[in-house]
């Protein structure tokens, strides 16, 4: 089982949804970066349950620093972080442990390994992403030294969406962080969609977009470690992610070359582009433009409606998520912080690689 991501700036996550704790080890972070437990609070609180449309499971997600820090600064050694699980209820899972959960990784894990932890989804649960968000905090602090900033936000829920990529600014970022849905979309419309989901006991997918400040470093390694390839690998590893695009993405198929190509211009003394259909990457390398992309998330499979399945002995039956279970009617809202973290982790890794690319 591969639990490590990254090359020079890497993370290894461990732990299960209903285990005593989860954790992550970050390797490759340069020494001298200021870091304290308080630095993790804003990002962890954005991923935590408690917002409308999220799971009622109550987890503080306090990050405990176990190693790699001395006198408030990174030492260059591995940084170990630990997050305790404090609100676990495994009974609803044990009651239907004789059958497979449709739409979940349980069947695939058991088929591959011959054994699986079914409680709360075990290792395949979205709970694992708390570790990624914690690691992403460190990556973001490192990138800030190079004036590279990333922001993710909910850009589509149901029929409510924003198609364009806004320009990154600290003011826009703060407006997203202050939003109960981490979104520039109409809050009343989102709240109504979530209310309808709760009333019908159903779930819904969505889209998370990400934007960055202009990246003047040449990040990305031809030909197999292009920036968009690394982002795709990172973002598609998030639970429930089903699609990724950069820039104009799949809409590029409907454009003529004369419409799609981004004209090169001089702006403020720098080579720039009049548009950014490419999403900030040419030849798999960043070119001084913002990186823009989107990730599509499926509806969560944990709904309070029966679905056909079979028992572990092969007998037809049904599975219904028990009333005592705690799940998100729209997991996309809490995926916002995970997308932001994974983009930061990719960029931090590529930035370290770029430091080795030329004299």
UniProtKB/Swiss-Prot annotation:
Cofactor: FMNH2
Name of the protein in question: Chorismate synthase
Catalytic activity from the UniProt record: 5-O-(1-carboxyvinyl)-3-phosphoshikimate = chorismate + phosphate
Family annotation (PANTHER family): CHORISMATE SYNTHASE
GO cellular component terms listed in the entry, alphabetical order: cytosol
Gene: aroC
Pathway: Metabolic intermediate biosynthesis; chorismate biosynthesis; chorismate from D-erythrose 4-phosphate and phosphoenolpyruvate: step 7/7
Residues involved in NADP(+) binding: 47
Keyword Amino-acid biosynthesis (UniProt): yes
EC number: 4.2.3.5
Summary of subunit composition and partner proteins: Homotetramer.
Function: This reaction introduces a second double bond into the aromatic ring system.
Organism: Chlamydia abortus (strain DSM 27085 / S26/3)
Keywords: Amino-acid biosynthesis, Aromatic amino acid biosynthesis, FAD, Flavoprotein, FMN, Lyase, NADP
Coiled coil: none
Keyword Lyase: yes
Gene Ontology terms, MF aspect: chorismate synthase activity; FMN binding
Cofactor note: Reduced FMN (FMNH(2)).
Residues bound to FMN: 123-125, 283, 298-302, 326
InterPro entries on file: Chorismate_synth (IPR000453), Chorismate_synth_AroC_sf (IPR035904), Chorismate_synthase_CS (IPR020541)
Family from the record: Belongs to the chorismate synthase family.
UniProt record, GO biological process: amino acid biosynthetic process; aromatic amino acid family biosynthetic process; chorismate biosynthetic process
């Amino acid at each position: 089982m591969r639990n490590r991501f990254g090359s020079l700036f890497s993370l290894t996550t461990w732990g299960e949804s209903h285990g005593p704790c989860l954790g992550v080890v970050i390797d490759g972070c340069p020494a001298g970066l200021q870091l304290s437990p308080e630095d993790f609070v804003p990002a962890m609180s954005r991923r935590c349950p408690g917002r409308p449309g999220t799971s009622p499971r109550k987890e503080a997600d306090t990050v405990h620093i176990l190693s790699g820090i001395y006198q408030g600064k990174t030492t260059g050694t591995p940084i170990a972080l630990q997050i305790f699980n404090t609100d676990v209820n495994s009974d609803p899972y044990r009651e239907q442990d004789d059958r497979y959960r449709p739409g979940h990784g349980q069947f695939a894990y058991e088929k591959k390994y011959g054994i699986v932890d079914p409680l709360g989804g075990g290792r395949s649960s979205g709970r694992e992403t708390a570790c990624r968000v914690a690691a992403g905090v460190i990556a973001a602090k490192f990138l800030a030294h190079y004036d590279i900033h990333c922001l993710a936000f909910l850009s589509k829920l149901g029929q409510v969406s924003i198609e364009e990529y806004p320009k990154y600014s600290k003011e826009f970022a703060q407006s997203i962080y202050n939003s109960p849905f981490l979104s520039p979309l109409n809050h009343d419309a989102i709240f109504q969609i979530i209310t309808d989901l709760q009333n019908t006991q159903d779930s819904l997918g969505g889209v998370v977009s990400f934007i960055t400040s202009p990246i003047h470093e040449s990040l990305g390694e031809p030909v197999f470690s292009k920036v968009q390839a690394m982002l795709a690998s990172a973002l598609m590893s998030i639970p429930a992610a089903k699609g990724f695009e950069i820039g104009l993405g799949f809409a590029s198929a409907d454009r003529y070359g004369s419409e799609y190509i981004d004209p090169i211009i001089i702006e403020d003394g720098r080579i720039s582009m009049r548009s950014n259909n490419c999403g900030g990457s040419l030849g798999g390398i960043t070119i001084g433009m913002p990186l823009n992309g989107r990730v599509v998330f499926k509806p969560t499979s944990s709904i309070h409606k029966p679905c056909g399945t079979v028992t572990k002995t092969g007998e037809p039956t049904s599975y219904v998520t028990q009333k005592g279970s705690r799940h998100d009617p729209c997991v996309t809202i809490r995926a916002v912080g995970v997308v932001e973290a994974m983009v930061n982790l990719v960029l931090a890794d590529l930035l370290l690689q770029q430091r080795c690319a030329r004299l």
